[in-house]
């Protein structure tokens, strides 16, 4: 063997195994060294090849990882998009299914309607055909009769002119009669058609109004939703602000902790916590964005609804215009009917005349048939006979009568037919309207079907494309599987080659080969290479082997590149099909990653093999050296080499088994992939089957649609006639919209006028006295006028008596003056003509005057009625003002609640709110002034009316004076012209007859007018019926609205349930947090106990070095506590997992399917969008909860880690030194100082909050005083209103009396006689009166216009009142719901507090048990140390400092203050009782006065009745007040019971506090005893050790005693601090609970007092009506609900503040746990 080869071999071994040359050279002399070198060379080659492969694999792996990450991101995006598309397609399919179902139902209904219409049409056609046949028969009979009549007329043409004239007259009359009948029937039909159209229009108006109301309701609902969303947004904004504040606090704390050097390590923020906070912020941002989007959508819906409102208003205007036109047409038709009736009357009169003439002619004709006439006719015309003529004539008359009967029958049939048609006209109209609606709906359905067909075609195309993609993906998967199988085969081949190579190792290598390898190892030169090549026949040269390995590497790389290219192409093709098969691809990716991991594992296994070989070499080298040292036998060396080779074979077998296991795992994964692919194929087949079913359904639906289209075409042909009507209705609707705009403007004006009407109240006081004085004056004038009227009546009676006497004288003188009358006839005729003309003119003027007087009287009556209405409106306005005052009081109470809510805000907010209140008060004052101005304006109008009435009375007086003058003149003229009057009386009688005829005519006219009035009354009845029908429809709408409200309540209940689930989960999280806090406290306690044990162990280690003794594990209480903590952590984890499962099982609220099915496509889409948004919101909330769960899990895991560290620390701290405990103590003291500082800051915050609460209470008291002042003012105003009402009633009575008096005067004036001399004067007076009447008419028109405006304003105000009432009801519902929610939360908090008390008690019991266990351990230690105990040294025993009880005294003071408040409340109740007694006394006095004021006059009987009624009302009110007083007594008793219960609870709480104090003192005493026992035991042990060491030195004893005293003092201080802290915590908890209970009870008492005061104030209002009392009671109930809600809210805010304080205390506890971790780490370092 050459030296170069050996050097090369040695160098190879040195490079490969990192072995020095000196260690390798002794191995050269061994025989198997060459074989070993050849094996190493082959192994080197394999390792180098594997290195290259590993490098390539790592590069490819990195490249694949990058590609895969990109693809995964791309696939995730596509998955999200595909999921979204799938959800959209599912939603579309569900919507289409719902639409198909709705279409089917609608089609069934339409088929039923169509069948009914067809049956009705067939019946109508049958009736028409029958009528046509009857008309044809009648026409044929008429034609036959006409032919017969014409033949008879031709035969009897020679009868004479008289018969012909009679027949012609009869025929004309009959034709006229027929025409009149037809005209009347047609006019009636037209009238009925117009009436029906009118009714249809009224019904359309009602439907439009109902739609308008529905739209208004929708607007209100949307506005409420917007308000709710705004509130939610405000809540979210508050949450965001709170989060920002928390983040700021966290950063501040972090900065503070970072400033400290020792604690900076403890509070290092984890990146995971920051990420979680960022995720929470992002989710909350998403929530805010969702709420904002929801609010914007609702606003858009509100805008759309407003647009619909405008359109409907325009429709309403158009309908009103058409109604006006129809009214005009009806008036025209009525006029035409009157004309026709007049014509009919004239024709009837003519018929009667003709019949009379006919009877005379018939009688004359009958005279011809006498025997003489027959003889004369026979002599004159022997061929002509009168008998034939008579018989023929009689036959003709019979035929005419039969024809008349037939005509009557036909007319009856025609009238019956017309009545049937009239009856069926509304049905046909309804059918037409339904047909129009059905056509519109069919058009809508056709459009929706077209859209659905388009969507289905798109979906089908997408399904086909996805199928193709799935097939392509399947092919690619098969190709990839084949590639994987090929690769697995290659791996198997490589493994087989490795096995072959490993087997060749055990064979013997020739010596020449070994020498060559050694030389190559020592000197890797060309010569050594040639030697190796000669010896190794497998390879021609080493370079060729290297080149072959490089070629193989290049081939592998090329193959890998090809594989990567193929994979990229396959993946590019797969990316197109990933939308539907994303799950399978993700699993494949996971499998690839697992394969990469397996390859990594293989590489690691190869590296392990290399390490094994190195170790084998080391062992072989050591064995060779040992053999060389002991004996140089070659056989022993060979044996060692054989053993090493066997070990290598064993390791190789292990490696081979591992590879087989990996291959089996890969095969299992492939099988799993195949099974998943089969499942995917099955799902695809199911989807195909469902798709086929959907296509079949679609084909059926298309067929149905074609049938519907055919029917729709038929219906469209019918609807063409009705489209004109629809266009008119659209125009009317546009006009309605314009009118609505005008109405809104008027409403705004009315609001201003309402504000002005409040000022009228003050002016009424001033005008009351003036009106009373004027009434007195008017009564005096009335008496004077009555006296004048009586004088006139006496004068007229006397005149009538004188006239009667004169008539007797005139009759006696008639005979004497008859001759003179004959002479004066000619002159009298002229005078009579003149008088006749004058009388006619006077009659006309008198009729006109009387008519105008009647119109004036009617207008006065109308004005009086309008005045009454105005007074009623004023009363209503006063009632509304009272209601508004009540609403103002409610708002003030709400304001007080809002002030209580915002206690944590700054004082600037309260000043701003006070400014707002002042501004609102100024607005109210301005409104009050405007109402006063309006009241002044109405009083001015009343004064103007009174002035007009005075003018009319003055005119009447003037007329009376003129009448007196005229009477005197007429008496003189009568005395002078006495003779002339006697001659003219006869003519006067004639004139009287004519006047009677004219009066008859007037009576006929009045009858006509009465008939017209009757018709108008009938129309009014008809309209009233329509109004009743409209009211019924409104009731139905209200019922529907109630149904909708019930549905909404159900939906809200579902939402409430979901919210309750959400709150329950939050409570679970709170429970988990509380348990975590408990665990932290237990952990801190465990740490303290560990420190104590460390100290004890240190002492024992110092004492018992000479005599150690074993301690059993069972005696360690710490280990038991650690075991308990582990169990608690496990329970927490299970609770969190169960909460997650329960959270996943939460279901969304199930909407009502019936209401959803009734919706259309657009409504369904909006509904689905809303639901999706709500689900997104819920998902965000779920994410927040999941993040909180993660945090809790992490805390639990950290606690588990801490427990593990504890367990290690317990084992390690037996050996640790005392120096480490000192460092831990210093850290613990620092932490305690930090906790004390945080507690101080929290106490300062509490004091600030209490100051703010006191300020708010003072403001509330001021507001209460203001409310009392407002109520007093309100009572004064009500009393003034009642006095004004009484005055107005008196005025109305006086006005009615004046009206009666005026009517009597006018009648007397009309009844008085007149002559020709005063006609001119009367004409002039009439002209002047007509002018006055015109002026009065103008004023009346102005007043009417003003009345109409006031009425419209009052209606608008009533609408606003209804809207406000609805809003108030909604708010009350919300308040009740919130109150229920807050009550449940409060109960939960109370239960938690009770649980905490129980836990604290359990902890105390645990502490006592632990102390007892420690005492037992001490006894055991004493027993084990059975050595003589020396005299214990005297140790100073420091007594524990007692805990200060200042806080306990403060709680007692607070309880005393609450008792004082209760005493004040009882005083207030006593005062209320005294006020009630006063009210009773006043009521009794009022009854006595009412009995004394009875007057027995007949004229005042009516007043008595009124007073009796008022007395009855007062008695009923007094009875009600007595009932209320009884209720108040009961409530007072309940309050007293509550006060007693409070006192008892206070006493019990004091006793509990004293018991807790005693328990704490007992604990302290027990601790002292245990400390003394421990000190005694340790002193015994120490003294024993000191006695042992006393022989050596005396200084050692003194040193040990000093150290022992120091440590004992430190222990006592620690124990005292711990006890004081626990005692303070217990006192704080007790004090907080007592404060909460006392505040709750005080709030309840304040509520009851407010309710009692309100009821007392209502009882004081005696003169107010019963309605106001009922409404006041309702307001008090609403005040209860509103007052309960803020109180509950205040309570919860206080509880939340306390929980925040606890949360702020929690971070230092975490720091203690972190301190424990640092301690454990320090222990490890020290070890």
Swiss-Prot record:
Residues 57-361, 443-463, 542-740, 804-1106, 1223-1427, 1497-1555, 1601-1664 form a coiled coil. Keywords: Coiled coil, mRNA transport, Nuclear pore complex, Nucleus, Phosphoprotein, Protein transport, Translocation, Transport. The modification Phosphoserine is found at residue 1706. One of its GO terms (molecular function) is structural constituent of nuclear pore. The keyword Amino-acid biosynthesis does not apply. It is found in: Nucleus, Nuclear pore complex; Nucleus envelope. Residues 1423-1448, 1672-1684, 1702-1714 have a biased composition (Polar residues). It comes from Schizosaccharomyces pombe (strain 972 / ATCC 24843) (Fission yeast). Gene3D superfamilies: 1.10.287.1490. PANTHER family: NUCLEOPROTEIN TPR, NUCLEOPROTEIN TPR-RELATED. The keyword Transport applies. Maintains the proteasome and its anchor cut8 at the nucleus envelope and is required for kinetochore component proteostasis. Proper kinetochore stoichiometry ensures the correct attachment of kinetochores to spindle microtubules during cytokinesis. Required for the localization of spindle assembly checkpoint (SAC) protein mad2 and bub1 to the nucleus envelope during interphase, but not their localization during mitosis. Disruption phenotype: Decreases cut8 localization to the nuclear envelope. Increases kinetochore component protein levels, including cnp3. Asynchronous kinetochore segregation during metaphase, with lagging kinetochores present during anaphase B. Increases spindle assembly checkpoint (SAC) activation and results in mitotic metaphase/anaphase transition delay. Abnormal chromosome segregation; lagging mitotic chromosomes during anaphase B and unequal mitotic sister chromatid segregation. Sensitive to thiabendazole. Residues 1423-1459, 1477-1500, 1656-1727 are annotated as: Disordered. The gene is alm1. It comes from the Eukaryota. This is Nucleoporin alm1. One of its GO terms (cellular component) is nuclear pore nuclear basket. Its main location: nucleus. One of its GO terms (biological process) is protein transport.
């Amino acid at each position: 063997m050459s030296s170069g080869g050996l050097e090369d071999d040695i160098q190879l071994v040195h490079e490969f195994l990192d072995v020095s040359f000196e260690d390798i050279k002794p191995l050269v002399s061994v025989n198997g060294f060459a074989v070993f070198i050849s094996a190493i060379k082959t192994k080197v080659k394999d390792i180098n090849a594997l290195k290259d492969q590993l490098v390539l694999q790592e590069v490819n792996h990195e490249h694949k990882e990058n590609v895969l990450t990109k693809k995964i991101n791309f696939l995730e995006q596509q998955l999200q998009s595909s999921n979204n598309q799938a959800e959209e397609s599912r939603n579309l399919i569900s919507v289409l299914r719902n639409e198909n179902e709705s279409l089917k139902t609608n089609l069934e209904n339409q088929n039923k309607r169509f069948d009914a219409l067809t049956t009705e049409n067939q019946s109508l056609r049958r009736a028409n055909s029958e009528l046509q046949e009857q008309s044809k028969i009648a026409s044929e009979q008429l034609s036959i009769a006409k032919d017969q009549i014409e033949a008879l007329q031709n035969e009897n043409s020679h009868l004479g002119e008289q018969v012909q004239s009679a027949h012609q007259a009869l025929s004309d009359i009959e034709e006229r009669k027929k025409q009149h009948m037809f005209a009347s029937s047609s006019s009636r039909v037209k009238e009925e058609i117009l009436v029906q159209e009118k009714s249809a229009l009224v019904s359309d108006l009602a439907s439009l109004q109902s739609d308008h109301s529905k739209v208004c309701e929708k607007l209100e609902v949307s506005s409420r939703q917007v308000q709710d969303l705004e509130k939610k947004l405000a809540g979210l904004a508050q949450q965001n602000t709170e989060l920002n504040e928390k983040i700021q606090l966290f950063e501040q704390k972090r900065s503070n902790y970072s400033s400290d050097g020792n604690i900076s390590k403890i509070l290092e923020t984890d990146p995971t916590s920051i990420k979680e906070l960022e995720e929470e912020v992002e989710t909350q941002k998403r929530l805010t964005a969702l709420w904002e989007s929801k609010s914007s959508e609702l606003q858009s819906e509100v805008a759309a609804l407003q647009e619909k409102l405008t359109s409907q208003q325009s429709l309403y205007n158009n309908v009103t215009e058409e109604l006006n036109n129809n009214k005009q047409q009806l008036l025209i038709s009525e006029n035409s009917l009157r004309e026709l009736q007049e014509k009919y009357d004239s024709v009837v009169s003519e018929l009667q005349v003709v019949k009379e003439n006919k009877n005379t002619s018939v009688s004359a004709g009958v005279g011809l048939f006498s025997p003489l006439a027959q003889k004369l006719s026979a002599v004159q015309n022997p061929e002509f006979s009168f008998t034939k003529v008579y018989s023929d004539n009689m036959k003709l008359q019979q035929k005419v009568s039969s024809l008349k009967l037939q005509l009557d029958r036909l007319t009856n049939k025609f009238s019956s037919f017309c009545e049937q048609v009239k009856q069926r006209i509304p049905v046909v109209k309804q059918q037409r309207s339904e047909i129009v609606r059905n056509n519109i709906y069919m058009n809508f359905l056709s459009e929706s079907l077209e859209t659905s067909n388009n969507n289905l075609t798109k979906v089908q195309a997408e399904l086909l494309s996805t199928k193709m993609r799935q097939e392509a993906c399947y092919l690619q998967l098969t190709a990839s599987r084949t590639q994987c199988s090929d690769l697995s085969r290659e791996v198997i081949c490589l493994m087989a080659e490795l096995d072959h190579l490993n087997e060749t190792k055990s064979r013997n290598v020739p010596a020449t080969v070994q020498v060559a390898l050694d030389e190559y190892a020592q000197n890797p030169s060309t010569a050594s290479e040639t030697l190796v090549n000669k010896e190794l026949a497998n390879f021609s040269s080493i370079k060729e082997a290297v080149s072959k390995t490089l070629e193989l590497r290049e081939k592998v790389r090329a193959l890998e590149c090809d594989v990567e290219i193929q994979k990229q192409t396959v993946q590019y093709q797969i990316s197109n099909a990933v939308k539907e098969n994303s799950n399978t691809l993700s699993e494949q990716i996971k499998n690839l990653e697992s394969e990469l991991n397996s390859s990594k594992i293989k590489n690691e296994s190869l590296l392990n093999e290399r390490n094994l070989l190195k170790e084998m070499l080391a062992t072989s080298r050591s064995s060779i050296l040992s053999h060389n040292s002991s004996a140089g036998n070659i056989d022993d060396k060979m044996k060692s080499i054989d053993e090493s080779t066997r070990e290598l074979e064993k390791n190789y077998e292990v490696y081979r088994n591992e590879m087989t296991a990996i291959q089996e795992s890969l095969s299992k994964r492939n099988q799993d992939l195949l099974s998943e692919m089969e499942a995917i194929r099955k799902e695809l087949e199911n989807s195909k089957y469902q798709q086929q079913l959907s296509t079949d359904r679609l084909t059926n639906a298309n067929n149905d649609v074609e049938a519907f289209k055919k029917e729709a075409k038929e219906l469209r042909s019918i609807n063409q006639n009705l489209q004109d009507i629809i266009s008119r209705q659209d125009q009317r609707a546009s006009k309605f919209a314009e009118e609505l705009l005008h109405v809104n403007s008027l409403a705004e004006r009315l609001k201003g006028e309402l504000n002005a009407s409040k000022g009228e109240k003050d002016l009424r006081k001033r005008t009351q006295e003036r009106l009373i004085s004027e009434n007195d004056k008017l009564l005096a004038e009335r008496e004077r006028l009555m006296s004048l009227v009586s004088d006139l009546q006496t004068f007229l009676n006397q005149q009538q008596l004188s006239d009667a006497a004169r008539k007797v004288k005139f009759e006696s003188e008639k005979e004497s003056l008859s001759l003179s009358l004959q002479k004066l006839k000619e002159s009298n005729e002229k005078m009579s003509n003149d008088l006749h003309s004058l009388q006619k003119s006077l009659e006309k003027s008198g009729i006109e005057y009387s008519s105008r007087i009647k119109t004036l009287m009617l207008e006065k009556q109308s004005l009086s009625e309008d005045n009454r209405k105005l007074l009623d409106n004023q009363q209503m306005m006063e009632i509304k003002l009272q209601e508004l005052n009540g609403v103002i009081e409610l708002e003030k109470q709400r304001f007080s609640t809002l002030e209580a809510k915002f206690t944590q805000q700054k004082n600037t907010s309260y000043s701003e709110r006070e400014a707002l209140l002042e501004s609102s008060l100024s607005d109210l004052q301005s409104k009050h002034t405007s109402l006063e101005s309006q009241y002044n304006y109405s009083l001015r109008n009343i004064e103007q009316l009174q002035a007009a009435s005075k003018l009319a009375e003055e005119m009447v007086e003037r007329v009376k004076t003129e009448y007196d003058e005229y009477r005197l003149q007429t008496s003189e003229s009568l005395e002078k012209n006495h003779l002339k009057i006697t001659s003219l009386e006869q003519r006067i009688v004639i004139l009287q007859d004519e006047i009677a005829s004219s009066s008859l005519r007037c009576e006929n006219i009045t009858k006509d007018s009465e008939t017209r009035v009757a018709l108008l009354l009938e129309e009014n009845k008809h309209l009233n019926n329509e109004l009743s029908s409209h009211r019924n429809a409104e009731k139905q709408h209200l019922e529907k609205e109630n149904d909708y409200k019930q549905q909404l309540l159900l939906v809200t209940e579902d939402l409430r349930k979901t919210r309750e689930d959400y709150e329950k989960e939050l409570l679970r999280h709170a429970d988990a947090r509380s348990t975590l806090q408990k665990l932290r406290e237990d952990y801190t306690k465990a740490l303290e106990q560990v420190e104590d044990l460390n100290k004890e162990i240190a002492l024992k280690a110092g004492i018992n070095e000479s005599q150690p003794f074993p301690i059993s594990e069972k005696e360690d209480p710490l280990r038991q506590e650690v075991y308990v903590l582990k169990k608690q952590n496990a329970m927490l984890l299970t609770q969190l997992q169960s909460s997650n499962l329960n959270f996943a099982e939460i279901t969304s609220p199930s909407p009502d399917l019936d209401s959803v099915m009734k919706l259309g496509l657009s409504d369904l889409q909006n509904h689905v969008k809303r639901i999706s948004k709500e689900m997104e919101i819920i998902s965000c909330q779920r994410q927040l909860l999941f993040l909180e769960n993660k945090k809790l899990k992490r805390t639990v895991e950290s606690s588990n880690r801490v427990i593990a560290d504890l367990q290690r620390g317990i084992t390690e701290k037996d050996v640790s030194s005392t120096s480490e405990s000192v460092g831990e103590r210093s850290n613990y003291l620092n932490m305690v100082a930090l906790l004390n500082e945080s507690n101080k800051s929290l106490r300062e915050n509490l004091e600030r909050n209490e100051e703010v609460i006191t300020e708010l209470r003072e403001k509330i008291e001021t507001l209460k005083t203001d409310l009392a002042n407002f109520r007093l003012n309100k009572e004064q105003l009500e009393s003034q209103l009642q006095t004004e009402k009484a005055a107005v009633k008196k005025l109305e009575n006086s006005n009615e009396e004046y009206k009666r008096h005026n009517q009597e005067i006018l009648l007397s004036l009309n009844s008085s006689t007149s002559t020709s001399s005063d006609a001119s004067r009367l004409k002039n007076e009439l002209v002047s009166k007509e002018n006055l009447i015109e002026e009065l008419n103008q004023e009346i028109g102005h007043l009417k216009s003003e009345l109409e405006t006031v009425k419209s304003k009052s209606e608008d105000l009533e609408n606003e009142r209804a809207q406000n009432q609805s809003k108030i009801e909604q708010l009350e519902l919300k308040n009740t719901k919130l109150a229920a929610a807050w009550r449940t939360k409060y109960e939960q908090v109370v239960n938690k507090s009770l649980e905490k008390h129980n836990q604290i008690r359990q902890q105390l019991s645990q502490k006592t048990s632990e102390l007892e266990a420690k005492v037992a351990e001490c006894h055991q230690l004493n027993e084990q140390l059975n050595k003589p105990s020396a005299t214990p040294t005297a140790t100073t025993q420091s007594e524990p400092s007692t805990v200060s009880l200042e806080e306990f005294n403060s709680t007692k003071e607070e309880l005393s203050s609450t008792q004082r408040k209760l005493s004040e409340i009882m005083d207030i109740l006593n005062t209320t009782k005294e006020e009630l007694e006063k009210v009773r006394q006043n009521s009794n006095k009022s009854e006595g006065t009412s009995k004394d004021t009875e007057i027995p006059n007949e004229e005042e009987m009516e007043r008595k009745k009124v007073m009796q009624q008022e007395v009855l009302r007062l008695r009923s009110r007094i009875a009600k007040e007595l009932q209320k007083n009884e209720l108040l007594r009961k409530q007072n008793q309940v309050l007293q019971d509550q006060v007693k219960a409070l006192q008892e609870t206070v006493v019990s709480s004091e006793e509990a506090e004293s018991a807790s104090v005693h328990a704490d003192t007992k604990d302290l005493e027990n601790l002292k005893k245990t400390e003394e026992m421990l000190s005694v035991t340790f002193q015994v042990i120490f003294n024993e050790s000191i006695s042992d060491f006393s022989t050596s030195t005396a200084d050692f004893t003194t040193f040990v005693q000093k150290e022992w005293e120091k440590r004992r003092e430190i222990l006592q201080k620690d124990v005292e601090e711990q006890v004081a802290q626990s005692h303070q915590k217990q006192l704080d908890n007790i004090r907080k609970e007592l404060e909460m209970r006392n505040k709750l009870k005080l709030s309840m008492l304040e509520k009851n007092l407010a309710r009692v005061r309100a009821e007392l104030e209502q009882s004081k209002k005696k003169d107010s009506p019963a309605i106001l009392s009922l409404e006041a009671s309702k307001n008090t109930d609403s005040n209860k609900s509103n007052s309960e809600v803020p109180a509950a809210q205040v309570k919860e805010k206080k509880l939340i503040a306390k929980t925040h304080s606890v949360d702020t205390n929690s971070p230092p506890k975490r720091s203690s746990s972190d301190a424990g971790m640092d301690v454990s780490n320090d222990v490890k370092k020290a070890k």
